[in-house]
Each structure stands twice: as C-alpha cells, then as structure tokens.
C-alpha cells in the first residue's frame, strides 16, 4: 500500500473541515443555500491556506447529486470522483504551464458544450496571474457572460498582477494566513488521529516555522516524523529547523538580565558549535521575552508547551521590571533588523547582545562603592595638581603641594557623580584642553569649588550621592528633554533653521523694513504706495532724486530687467496718487554706492544688528564661563540676529 502524505490525506472534504477562513466559508455556504451563485469566483491568499481546497469543495457543492448544497453528501458518484480528482466536468488548469493565448482559446472553444455528468461545468484555473496579457484579453468576454452551465473558479497568490478588468468580473475572497494556534491545534488533532506521539513544544516550533501555511506545516510534520523515528520530538524538530531549544535561548535571556557577559559569550560559542541560524536565535529570544511579558500581564498566559521551563519563566516575570523587559525586547528587535547589514551574522548577534549588556538598566556605576562612605581617597585621582603636571617624573610625594581640602574633594566627587547620573558628562576634546584646565595660577575653577565647599560643609557629603539612584543610570537621555522644550519657547525650530541658513525670518525682515522707513524718506514713501510686487521691487532697488514734479529713480544696473514701460507707468501713477500732483517719472541706471536704496538700507541695518549680536554673545557671562571652564569655542559665523 502506497503512503500518502499528510497534506493530501487530510485535505478538507467538507466546509466544516477547513481550518480558519470563516469569512469565506460563511459567504459561500449562504450563497449555495440561497441559490445566489456567481459565475466567477477569485480566491487569493498566500500558499497553503486552502484556495484550491475551497474551490473543489465549491465544485462539489454545485455538482452533488442531492442538489446544490453547502453540505454535499460525499458518497454520491460526483462527490467521490471530485475527491479522487477524476470528475470529467471539473477541469483543473495550471495557468503557470499554460500561459499562451492559444491554450486559452482551446479552453474557450469547449465552454459552449454542456456538462457530461454534473450540473455545471467548472473551470478551476490555479495561479491565474501567470496568464499572459493576450490570454486575459481572450478570457474577458467569456468571463463576463459565460453560458449558464459554466462556472469559473480562479486561484492566485498575487492578485495585484491581475488586470482590473478581470477583478471586476469576479467575486473575490481573500484567504488569511493562519495563526500559530490554529496550525498547532490542527497538527495536534491530526497526530492524535494518526496515533503518532508528539510533544507540545515541537508542535509549537512547527507551527511557527510554517509561517501561516497549513500545507507547509503538514509537510514539515512529515519530515519531523521521519527525523524523530516515528514521533515528533522537540529535539528532532529543533535539529531539523536549526533552532535552539528553549533551555539555551532562555539561558541567554537570563545571562543578559543578570549582566553576565562571560556567560553570554559562552552560550554563543555553544550555539555556533551547533551550526545555529543566527536570526532564528534572536527570534527565539524575542519570543521568550514576549511570553514573559504576557505572563506579567496574565499569569495564565503560559501554555502547556512551556512546561519544561515554566518555573524559570515565572521567576523572570516576577523579578524583571516591565520597563527593563521592553528595553531588552527593543534592543533585540533593532538588532534583528540590522542583522543583514552586519559583516557577519554571528558578529551582528554578538554586538546586539553586547548592546543589551551595555544598556543594562541596573548596571552599577563604574566607580566603586567606597566614595559613598568617604570621599578622601578620591581627591588625588579626581584633580591633578599643578606640580604633577610640571614634574611628571618626580617620584617623591613631598614635592607636591597639599591636596585640596576634604570638603572640596567631596564636592568635586559629588559633582562628577551627579553629572554621570544625569547624563550631562561630556567627553573632553583634547589633551591640550585638559592641560589648560589644570593651570596652577588663577584657576577660577578651584576658586569656585572652594566657595561651594563652604556652603556644603554643614551638610553630610554622602547625601549628595543618595540623590542620584543608580537604577536610573540607563535613562540618561531623559535629562535633555526640558532643555529642548525651553529652546522652543525662545524661537521655533523653523525660525532658527532659517536664521542659520543665512535667511531672514519674517519677523526680522519686518523689523528691518520698519527701521529703514525711519531712516530713509524714500523707503517711507515706498511703503505708502499701492504697487504690485514686481513694480515695488523697482522702487526698492532705486534711490530717488526729485526736482519739482520731475522724479528720477536711480536703479541699480543689476536690476535693469525690472525696468519696463508698464512698470514706469504704474509707478508714476502711484506717485501721482500719493502726492496729488502729476509726476513725470524717469528711470536711469546708477551704481553710485554713496546713496543707498531702501533694500540697501535694510542690509546695512542687518549688518549693524549682526555686529551687536556678536558683541552681545561674546560679552555674555554664561558664554565666557563655558569658554573658560570647558574650553568651548565660539563659532562666530553661526551667530545671527533673531
């Protein structure tokens, strides 16, 4: 007796046997029951979700000897022949192998003949999107008005490739990909009926690897049965799929949570020795993190497939804060997205896990715990005294002056500690900058520390450190949020961007125009004229010379293209209306820089404001403090008046 694979043996024989796709089955069953049967159906969806199976069930319901029904008998000759694939009036066509227009025409030549055995002649065209354009054109007329005894059932995995004229002539049903639980439940039912031993975790792995396709899941199950010597075991499925078992993936998660870098690298070496698929490793860890998060939300969310590691999963759900869990999940998720760009897949996984360790939320600060009790040992390492800089080779400690007072050292260490906790510590730029900060004479930083120490001597030094909890070290970026908000109040980002791009904001342009009106009578007169924008540019780029009713405008030669007879007439009319007398206007080209035009007045005022802005920035106490203590460099070219 020949063996029949599970995917063929367990093909649905009734609508009730179909897994999922209730939205499609309900519509088809109601149509068959009511007798409202369309002449063309299109089933679309990914591979292995039941497109061809549902089409055959529909053909069985149309040609059952008991009548058109949603529940065919399955015992009549027509039903049995359809199940066996030898029903003469069910013509199945593989469009991928018959793409030529001649094949389509041969098919349509037989449409006119009545069915030989059944009630309807059913044409089942699989992968219909593979037909050529000419084949679609040949099919259009028949598909729109077929004979009463003909039904078309089309199936495709890519409906976007079908012409809209074909889509408009069909009832389209899109079949959804099955979820993991639906596939797992069906596999469990089939294996129980086949009396094959199986493990819940193995079915979970097979269901996830099927990626929504029940046919793929059954094919993988056949392979797993062969690999497991007649049973479906987790070990055999993991080896077949190239995935880690739960214990190894969970051990990696535990090592990351415990910030145990050596354990992480050891587990990665073990995974490499097994020839693991690296992306599958990240997927498995992400799946475990998801299950832990679900257990935190609902303790009953842990299914029976996790029985072997249930205790460890619940312990992680109890001890790991939800915020930390989300951080690990996001880190691994981003690492998986960046994996194709890594020089090597293993390298990408290692860097992802190292990133998770680097951003460990509960990582202690790099400094030892001893400064919390006493800051005295910190003084020699926190501040480099001047003699150490001048005599680096002197071994005798007597040559160095006395260290800073204990209170000053405590304040310095506390300040450094608080800066690290708040995320404001900046990397020093260069060694010369470090040397300039350690000048032995007139060091205002030391003077400031001395003044601060007088104010904090009465306060216990350890209290300064207690204000910075170590647990929040990983969330340094939050400290920058108020700074951004305060900047937005001063000027909008759009205005600042325009200013830095050498563009004047509308507010600044209005100020410059107002001041130009105060300084230049001709600019004031232009502001009172009612002119089109193009004509106004003529007036703004010229200076006026008047003798009685004769007005001469001296236009810059670079703007000669603005001068036209129409512009002169409109400008003369506007001047006449403003003065109440007839003005005789002439325009000549003149590049004399001694007299400014209104636009040149605005530019001159802008230069004055720019010079004032530079002086104000340079003289600002805060800027001077930054330059003195942090060796900041002022980019004067970026200064713009706002």
From Swiss-Prot:
Region (Disordered): 385-441
The enzyme's E.C. designation: 2.7.7.7
SUPFAM superfamilies reported in the protein's UniProt record: P-loop containing nucleoside triphosphate hydrolases, post-AAA+ oligomerization domain-like
SMART domains (UniProt xref): AAA
Reactions catalysed: DNA(n) + a 2'-deoxyribonucleoside 5'-triphosphate = DNA(n+1) + diphosphate
Pfam families assigned to the protein according to its UniProt record, in alphabetical order: DNA_pol3_delta2, DNA_pol3_gamma3, DNA_pol3_tau_4, DNA_pol3_tau_5, DNAX_ATPase_lid
GO cellular component: DNA polymerase III complex
BP GO annotations: DNA-templated DNA replication; viral translational frameshifting
Residues the entry annotates as binding Zn(2+): 64, 73, 76, 79
UniProt entry keywords in alphabetical sequence: ATP-binding, DNA replication, DNA-directed DNA polymerase, Metal-binding, Nucleotide-binding, Nucleotidyltransferase, Transferase, Zinc
Keyword Magnesium on entry: no
The UniProt record lists the keyword Transcription regulation: no
InterPro entries: AAA+_ATPase (IPR003593), ClpA/B (IPR001270), DNA_pol3_clamp-load_cplx_C (IPR008921), DNA_pol3_tau_IV (IPR022001), DNA_pol_III_gamma-3 (IPR022754), DNA_pol_III_sug/sutau_N (IPR012763), DNA_pol_III_tau_dom-5 (IPR021029), DNA_Rep/Repair_Clamp_Loader (IPR050238)
Enzyme class: transferase
GO MF annotation list: ATP binding; ATP hydrolysis activity; DNA binding; DNA-directed DNA polymerase activity; metal ion binding
Biased composition (Pro residues): 394-404
Biased amino acid composition, Polar residues: 416-425
Chain sites annotated for binding ATP: 45-52
Description of how the protein assembles with itself and partners: The DNA polymerase holoenzyme is a complex that contains 10 different types of subunits. These subunits are organized into 3 functionally essential subassemblies: the pol III core, the beta sliding clamp processivity factor and the clamp-loading complex. The pol III core (subunits alpha, epsilon and theta) contains the polymerase and the 3'-5' exonuclease proofreading activities. The polymerase is tethered to the template via the sliding clamp processivity factor.
Main function: DNA polymerase III is a complex, multichain enzyme responsible for most of the replicative synthesis in bacteria. This DNA polymerase also exhibits 3' to 5' exonuclease activity.
Entry's family note: Belongs to the DnaX/STICHEL family.
Name used for this protein in its record: DNA polymerase III subunit tau
Organism (species): Salmonella typhimurium (strain LT2 / SGSC1412 / ATCC 700720)
Record lineage: Bacteria, Pseudomonadati, Pseudomonadota, Gammaproteobacteria, Enterobacterales
């Amino acid at each position: 007796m020949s063996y029949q694979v599970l995917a063929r043996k367990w093909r649905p024989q009734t609508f009730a046997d179909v897994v999922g796709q209730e939205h499609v089955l309900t519509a088809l069953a109601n149509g068959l029951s009511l007798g409202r049967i369309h002449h063309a159906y299109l089933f679309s969806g990914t591979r292995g979700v039941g497109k061809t199976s549902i089409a055959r069930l529909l053909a069985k319901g149309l040609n059952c000897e008991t009548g058109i029904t949603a529940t065919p008998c399955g015992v009549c000759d027509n039903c049995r022949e359809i199940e066996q694939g030898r029903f003469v009036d069910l013509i199945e066509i593989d469009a991928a192998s018959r793409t030529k227009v001649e094949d389509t025409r041969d098919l349509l030549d037989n449409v006119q003949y009545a069915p030989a055995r059944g009630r309807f002649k059913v044409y089942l065209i699989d992968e219909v999107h593979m037909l050529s354009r000419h084949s679609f054109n040949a099919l259009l007329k028949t598909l729109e008005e077929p004979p009463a005894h003909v039904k078309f059932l089309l199936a495709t995995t890519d409906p976007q490739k079908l012409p809209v004229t074909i889509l408009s002539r069909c009832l389209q049903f899109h079949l959804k990909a099955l979820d993991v639980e639906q596939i797992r439940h069906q596999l469990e039912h089939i294996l129980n009926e086949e009396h094959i031993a199986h493990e819940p975790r193995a079915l979970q792995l097979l269901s996830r690897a099927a990626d929504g396709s029940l046919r793929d899941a059954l094919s993988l199950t056949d392979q797993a049965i062969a690999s497991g010597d007649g049973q479906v075991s987790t070990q055999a499925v993991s080896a077949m799929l190239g995935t880690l078992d739960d214990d190894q993936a969970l051990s990696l998660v535990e090592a990351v949570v415990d910030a145990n870098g050596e354990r992480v690298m050891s587990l990665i070496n073990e995974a490499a020795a097994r020839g693991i698929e690296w992306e599958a490793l990240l997927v498995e860890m992400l799946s475990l993190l998801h299950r832990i998060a679900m257990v935190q939300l609902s303790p009953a969310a842990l299914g029976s497939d996790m029985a072997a590691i249930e205790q460890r999963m619940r312990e992680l759900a109890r001890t790991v804060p939800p915020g930390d869990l989300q951080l690990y999940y996001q880190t691994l998720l981003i690492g998986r997205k960046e994996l194709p760009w890594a020089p090597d897949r293993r390298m990408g996984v290692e860097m992802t896990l190292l990133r998770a360790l680097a951003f460990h939320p509960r990582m202690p600060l790099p400094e030892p715990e001893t400064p919390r009790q006493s800051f005295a040992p910190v003084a020699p390492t926190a501040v480099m005294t001047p003699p150490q800089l001048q005599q680096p080779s002197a071994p005798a400690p007597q040559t160095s002056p006395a260290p800073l007072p204990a209170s000053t050292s405590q304040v310095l260490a506390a300040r450094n500690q608080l800066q690290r906790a708040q995320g404001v510590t900046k990397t020093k730029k260069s060694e010369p900058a470090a040397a300039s900060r350690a000048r032995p004479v007139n060091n205002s930083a030391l003077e400031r520390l001395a003044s601060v120490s007088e104010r904090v001597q009465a306060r216990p030094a350890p209290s300064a450190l207690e204000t910075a909890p170590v647990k929040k070290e990983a969330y340094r970026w939050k400290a920058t949020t108020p700074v951004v908000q305060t900047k937005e109040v001063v000027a909008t980002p759009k205005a600042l961007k325009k200013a830095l791009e050498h563009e004047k904001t509308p507010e600044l342009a209005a100020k410059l125009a107002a001041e130009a009106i105060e300084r230049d009578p001709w600019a004031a007169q232009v502001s009172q004229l009612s002119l089109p924008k193009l004509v106004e540019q003529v007036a703004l780029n010229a200076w006026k010379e008047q003798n009685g009713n004769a007005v001469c405008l001296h236009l810059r030669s670079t703007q000669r293209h603005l001068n036209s007879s129409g512009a002169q007439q409109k400008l003369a009319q506007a001047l006449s209306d403003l003065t109440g007398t007839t003005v005789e206007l002439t325009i000549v080209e003149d590049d004399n820089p001694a007299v400014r035009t209104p636009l040149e007045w605005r530019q001159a005022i802008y230069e004055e404001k720019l010079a004032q802005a530079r002086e104000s920035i340079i003289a600002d106490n805060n800027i001077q403090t930054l330059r003195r203590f942090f060796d900041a460099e002022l980019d004067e070219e970026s200064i713009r008046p706002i």
